[in-house]
Curated annotation (Swiss-Prot):
Residues 85-99 have a biased composition (Pro residues). Belongs to the arenaviridae Z protein family. GO terms for molecular function: RNA binding; zinc ion binding. GO terms for biological process: viral budding from plasma membrane; viral budding via host ESCRT complex. This is RING finger protein Z. Its main location: virion. Residues 14-24 have a biased composition (Polar residues). It comes from Mobala mammarenavirus (isolate Rat/Central African Republic/Acar 3080/1983). The gene is Z. Residues 1-27, 79-99 are annotated as: Disordered.
Amino acid sequence: MGQKPSKPKAPPTTYESPRSSLTPDATGFGPEFCKSCWFERKGLIKCQNHYLCMTCLTLLLTVSNRCPVCKYPLPTKLRLEKSPTAPPPEATNPPPYSP
């Protein structure tokens, strides 16, 4: 008695994050390292104003969805800086098998 009917809850808003860039090799950036482990320079992902390596990003996403460095949401969608390439197909057939 005396209780007001509950209001229907609004659906949760989804945060549409833009894709973060994945840099395969950051040696051309100068002294850019992963801000979490300070070791990796390859496979860096841009997170706001710093970079994280894939290993640290994966580990951090298992704990929280916020970056411990900048407090912004961690990137979950990636955009490749360079398209992946494959070696050219061989023009000749491999030698026949001989035991």
